[in-house]
From Swiss-Prot:
Residues 109-124, 131-144 have a biased composition (Basic and acidic residues). The modification Phosphoserine is found at S165. Residues 100-152, 166-194 are annotated as: Disordered. This is Uncharacterized protein C12G12.09. Coiled coil: none annotated. It comes from Schizosaccharomyces pombe (strain 972 / ATCC 24843). Keywords: Phosphoprotein. GO terms for cellular component: cytoplasm; cytoplasmic stress granule; cytosol. Residues 166-175, 183-193 have a biased composition (Polar residues).
Length: 977
């Protein structure tokens, strides 16, 4: 099918041209293979915040929105079993204290809604490293004496094995608590399981006695982002807990990228033997086996999953040879029959159609082929001839506009989704009558919908995710999209027509891309393999109980593309993670999945193992590896349109842009350059992180950032502009940039469209949407006045804060230093002396105000004798100013550092009790200003350099961060209600 021909859907009947498709299929097999690689074109900006070098404390307030700093906890990574790990809080849970003392919880005028039942905290206890090491080695020693037929491992959460070193912090939102549980050698899996069930009834989860851990429960909602913290340690998966299938030496060098070297169907196993050119087929019931031979190293092998036919094995080798064997069981002997071989087939991806053993799909160049082998008979086929000489081999295909990156077929076999660059094309899949002998009854390939992905980087792969509804009709409600070099997985829920979840497989400490992404028919489980980790996610999609007439996935996608919406938000229901200890994972395959258990086959460097995970009642509520940050939003966006999308507008506009530099009409150039300026930063992290102070700062920052990075942006602009035009981040741009940036952007793009620049970046051939660009230009101009007013309002925040800080200052002494060289030292000494005198006569409040006015190390040293409860007499404005100046002091003495933490904690707790009354009774201290100062204080506290190795000091520092975060959440709730 020609992608650009103007044909109606009814005329697009590729199944009716089987003969023509066969000829194209066989001719394409002998040509060169296609290239699937696409570079990552991530265009995220990082703006380094400025800081002045002061001897005592930092510069005056910079009112900035540091969302990224708030969500990135610096947690050092440590070994799994070598360091001593103890929880920070043994007998005191600061989170419970914060909840109990919150005015929003106690005040009858609380603006917050009642927490749902699923927002229950489960504080779990931890053990020391010595107990863990002892129990771990005892388990290994016991495992060596186990039989190789051990089939099941207890189903545990990822958090069951999460560990922290003394230098690490537990989650600041919900620190773990509880008494330590002693480790006993006699503890068995069944005893632990029984104890867990008993503790669940008491609402107390007791961990496995040999490992420390913590678990946080979350309330499922739209837009959650799950990430793996740097300190995350997965559950150790011991081979003694698996059923060994075969022992083999399988080094990584033997196999290729995305290899599948083992599969199972019914009672048959097929796996690559010690020789990479040998495939061993094993009957698990009779222990009989035989060896199949290939011309070169095996790259992939798959069993057909049709339970009503004989097993068929599809094999591909490194020389692009394709084999199909039929497995036969004759009484007590196992035998095979080679159906056919395709020599040197330059295919990309090849696999069976779901629940089929007579049709498989494969990619050749820019086309997806469906091959039918149901009419082939092995007794009259010579395995040495080419496939084009066979009688009975049928093929149908669909052509795409570019190289196919990935494709997936729905569980009900009604839809095939094909990923090309940043677009997903959905076609109806008439599998039942695609190769009907009657031409009038043959099914049609119909274009259902097109999804335009708007991602921070290029999409890598796609996969359908299904779950059976009440009527037992399988409908795939979710499509998984991996991007950012397979480090982020986004879940697009068709019920809401939006990305509802993102799972991040990387953090600041390590990058762990997804090396394999697996889903199983009729299941909502996602299995991701990364390095030596197996991560399992169970997604509960939106409820489609009200769809009624929708009978399959094709009907659902078609209805959603036309504007209909079904159900509520989906959410990640369960998270499990296992780490294979001392072994490398070559490949993982799913062989069975239902509501009670999950069966996997692991191809490890030492052999093949069958691993079964059984469900457990303690996973009824959702668990997360890291408590989601409410400020962290999903970046992935997508728009679903009905049918195929025309690209005629793109081609027409590309010529206009190419001739832009030759035009002498300034108005034409101005329109185009301003439009390009609107789409230059699709993700807009610059404007997310920095709020401009005034128009001059806007001009300065826009100029410096754009001039230094404009060339790098245009290197990726050729593949992104069409998507960015409709990106929702354009609204963010219109709300934050000021009118002062217009002239600067215009001058920059006039330079860009000069002839020398066009010669340098000749790839500007890519087109843009003319109408959308024109509309954006009009919107951009009309919003300038509002943006300028917003910038001026933000610019006044610093001035207002400075005025507030002077309300309660005391008059300074009349002492005047005679020498300018010792002015600062004399003033600091005078303030310190005055503070000390005020403390001596018990005027604690006046001493605190004096320090707030002129903060210094000497003045703070004089405050050490002031009891922290004296802060209760201070006003809210003074407390806010006090925690601000105290957080900026640079302290290098352990005793002073400890005193600062104690005073900051007391002042912050006092602020929490008076927050609502401050906002209701004060006309000057606004919630916006209050929130800005608290964010700056939180940023400064996170950057404290603790002096000494006192565990008490570390716990107080952690508690202070938790208190500030709780205060910030309460202010945000007040602002949002």
């Amino acid at each position: 099918m020609s992608f650009y021909k103007e044909k109606s859907i009814n005329e697009t009947n590729l199944g009716s041209f089987v003969d023509e498709s066969n000829e194209l299929f066989f001719s394409a097999l002998s040509e060169s293979s296609m290239n699937h690689g696409t570079p990552d074109d991530s265009i995220l900006l990082d703006l380094v915040s400025r800081s002045d070098n002061k001897d005592l404390y930092q510069d005056s307030l910079d009112v900035r929105d540091n969302f990224s700093n708030l969500s990135s906890d610096e947690i050092p990574q440590s070994s799994s079993y070598e360091q001593t790990r103890k929880p920070f809080f043994h007998h005191f849970n600061p989170f419970e204290f914060l909840e109990a003392t919150s005015p929003l919880q106690q005040n009858g005028k609380s603006r917050d809604t009642e927490k749902p039942p699923s927002m229950k905290e489960k504080d779990l206890s931890s053990n020391s490293s010595s107990q863990h090491d002892k129990a771990f080695h005892e388990r290994v020693d016991q495992g060596k004496n186990k039989s190789s037929t051990t089939k099941y491992q207890e189903f545990r959460t990822v958090a069951d094995y999460r560990e922290f070193s003394p230098g690490q912090s537990v989650n600041s939102l919900k620190p773990n608590s509880g008494d330590e549980v002693p480790s006993t050698k006699s503890s068995t899996s069944s005893e632990m399981h029984t104890q867990l069930l008993k503790d669940e009834q008491k609402k107390i989860l007791t961990p496995a006695p040999d490992v420390p851990h913590d678990v946080y429960c979350i309330e499922p909602s739209l837009g959650r982002v799950f990430s793996f913290p740097a300190s995350f340690v997965a559950s150790p998966l011991l081979l003694e807990d698996c059923n060994k299938i075969a022992s083999c030496d399988l080094p990584y060098s033997t196999f290729y990228a995305n290899s599948q070297v083992i599969d199972k169907f019914s009672e048959y196993f097929a796996y690559v033997d010690q020789d990479p050119c040998h495939i061993r087929v094993l009957n698990a019931n009779t222990d009989q086996s035989l060896i199949l031979y290939t011309q070169s190293d095996v790259k992939n092998l798959h069993f057909g999953k049709n339970k009503h036919t004989k097993p068929h094995l599809l094999v591909m080798d490194a020389l692009s040879n394709l084999y199909v064997w039929k497995i036969l069981q004759k009484r007590s002997e196992i035998s095979v029959s080679l159906l056919f071989t395709i020599r040197r087939a330059n295919y990309g991806i090849c696999d069976w159609i779901p629940n089929s053993s007579n049709m498989f799909s494969m990619i050749v160049k820019n086309s997806l082929y469906i091959v039918d082998i149901s009419n082939i008979r092995s007794n009259n086929i010579s395995p040495k001839v080419y496939a084009k000489d066979f009688n009975g081999l049928q093929a149908a295909k669909v052509d795409l506009p570019g190289p196919i990156n990935s494709y997936t077929i729905s569980s009900d076999r009604s839809v095939v989704a094909i990923l090309v660059n940043s677009q997903i094309f959905f076609y109806s899949f008439p599998v039942s009558n695609l190769f009907s002998t009657n031409p009038s009854h043959r099914g049609n390939w119909a274009a259902i919908a097109t999804m335009s992905l708007q991602l921070p980087s290029t999409a890598n792969s796609i996969s359908f995710l299904s779950s059976p509804p009440n009527n037992n009709d399988i409908i795939d409600k979710v499509i998984c999209v991996s991007y950012a070099n397979n480090t982020i997985l986004g879940l697009f829920d068709f019920g809401l027509c939006a990305f509802t979840q993102e799972i991040e497989f990387s953090n600041e400490k390590e990058k762990s891309p997804i090396q394999q992404l697996l889903t199983f028919n009729n299941s909502n489980m996602i299995v991701a393999k990364r390095n030596q980790l197996l991560d399992i996610f169970i997604y509960s999609p939106s409820d489609l109980s009200n769809v009624g007439v929708l009978s399959n996935t094709a009907a659902l996608i078609s209805a959603v593309s036309k504007g209909k919406r079904f159900g509520d938000s989906g959410y990640i229901n369960k998270v499990i993670s296992n780490e294979v200890v001392d072994h490398s994972i070559v490949f993982v395959t799913l062989i069975g999945c239902d509501s009670s258990k999950l069966e996997l086959i692991l191809a490890l460097s030492s052999g093949y193992f069958q691993f079964c995970i059984e469900s457990d009642s303690k996973f009824d509520e959702g668990t997360s590896l890291e408590y989601p940050n409410s400020d962290k939003r999903i970046l992935a966006r997508a728009s679903l349109t009905s049918g195929l999308k025309s690209n005629n507008t793109l081609r027409a506009l590309s010529q206009d842009l190419k001739n832009c530099a030759k035009s002498k009409d300034d108005s034409t150039t101005q329109n185009l350059t301003e439009s390009l300026g609107s789409v230059c930063y699709p993700s807009m992290p610059f404007f997310n992180q920095y709020v401009p102070q005034n128009p001059n700062e806007v001009r300065e920052n826009i100029s410096s950032v754009m001039k230094s990075r404009i060339h790098a942006k245009f290197e990726s602009l050729h593949s992104r502009v069409e998507l960015v035009v409709k990106n929702s981040y354009m609204k963010l741009l219109e709300q934050t940039i000021s009118e002062a940036a217009t002239d600067e952007i215009s001058d920059l793009f006039k330079l860009i469209h000069s002839k020398p620049f066009l010669l340098e970046v000749g790839f500007l051939e890519t087109g843009f949407l003319a109408n959308d660009l024109e509309n954006l230009t009009s919107t951009y101009r009309s919003s300038n006045r509002q943006l300028c007013d917003f910038s001026n309002r933000i610019g006044n925040i610093n001035q207002k804060l400075e005025k507030l800080l002077m309300i309660e200052r005391l008059e300074t002494s009349d002492q005047s230093p005679t020498s300018s060289s010792n002015f600062e030292e004399s003033e600091s000494f005078a303030v310190s002396k005055k503070v000390l005198e005020l403390v001596r006569i018990s005027k604690n409040k006046e001493a605190l105000i004096c320090f707030t006015k002129d903060p210094s190390i000497e003045a703070f040293r004089s405050l050490q004798d002031v009891p922290d409860y004296s802060l209760d007499d201070c006003s809210s404005i003074h407390l806010l100013a006090f925690i601000h100046v105290l957080s900026k002091l640079i302290i290098k003495e352990e005793q002073l550092s400890f005193s600062r933490l104690q005073l900051l904690s007391r002042a912050t707790s006092r602020l929490r009790t008076m927050t609502l009354s401050v906002f209701n009774n004060s006309g000057t201290l606004t919630p916006e200003l209050f929130s800005s100062v608290v964010r700056i204080v939180l940023k400064n506290v996170r950057e404290f350099v603790l002096i000494g190795n006192s565990s008490i000091q570390k716990s107080k520092h952690e508690f202070l961060i938790t208190t500030l975060q709780a205060l910030l959440r309460e202010v945000d709730i007040f602002l949002n209600t």
